[in-house]
Design a protein with these regions (language model features):
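A detector for small-residue-rich transmembrane helices and their helix-helix packing motifs
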Residues: 1-212
């Protein structure tokens, strides 16, 4: 029986946040030497990060790694700040999606955006640097939210340019962050996740506005 205050429709969301926090918490404690062993983070990245080279001629650490990494990378983060920003965003966007869709639809968008973000990163990212973080999936959630808003505005003959303005703002923000981070921002995953989430929003069921 769920305790008061826990929404049963948010169980997958709770689980995602918990898993990401536990993993990064353990890695951060390992970095400080409290648990684990030297270079524990590097080893976890070796097995769980998204490595574009594994889609070419690199030898995987285990047979399923070239496929599993399309999902596992989204559970890893580069540090506590990276984790905090992504989990706060996941909590906010996740609830917004679950306000309009079922838990199953949320899973479709989130996992689909993880796959789509990784695929676009593999195609467009220069070099063979690895990728970690849930931001591809987060942009997928945002893409779904904006797609539903566009659909609602279209049905109500509202201002559809509002959605276009938000998309352009997001593109500009990614450009600024990419420059500020000296090209280390995985904008390709953001783009792929967003497009996947947008498309998924047109394919899955959602609650009408009046029933939210």
């Amino acid at each position: 029986m769920l305790e008061a205050g826990l929404n049963p429709n948010h169980l997958f969301l709770y689980g995602l946040i918990t898993i990401c926090c536990v993993i990064e918490g353990a890695l951060s404690l390992g970095d400080l030497g409290f648990i684990g062993f030297a270079h524990m983070r590097s080893l976890v990245y070796d097995y769980g990060a998204f490595w574009p080279g594994l889609l070419n001629n690199w030898t995987p650490n285990y047979a399923a790694q070239p496929y599993a990494m399309f999902v596992t990378y989204s559970f890893l983060h580069s540090g506590l700040v990276h984790l905090a920003v992504n989990m706060i965003t996941l909590w906010s966007l996740g609830r917004a999606v679950l306000d309009r869709a079922s838990q199953g639809s949320f899973v479709v968008v989130y996992v689909g955006a993880s796959l789509g973000g990784a695929a676009v990163f593999a195609v467009l990212a220069p070099g063979l640097r690895p990728m970690v973080g849930a931001s591809g999936s987060l942009f997928g959630l945002l893409g779904a939210i904006l797609a539903w808003e566009y659909i609602d505005q279209y049905a109500d003959r509202g201002d559809r340019w509002h959605v276009a303005k938000v998309v352009m703002l997001l593109a500009g923000l990614n450009l600024v962050l990419w420059w500020a981070m000296d090209g280390q921002l995985a904008w390709q995953a953001h783009f792929g996740g967003f497009i996947t989430g947008w498309i998924a929003a047109f394919l899955i069921g959602r609650k009408p506005l009046e029933n939210r």
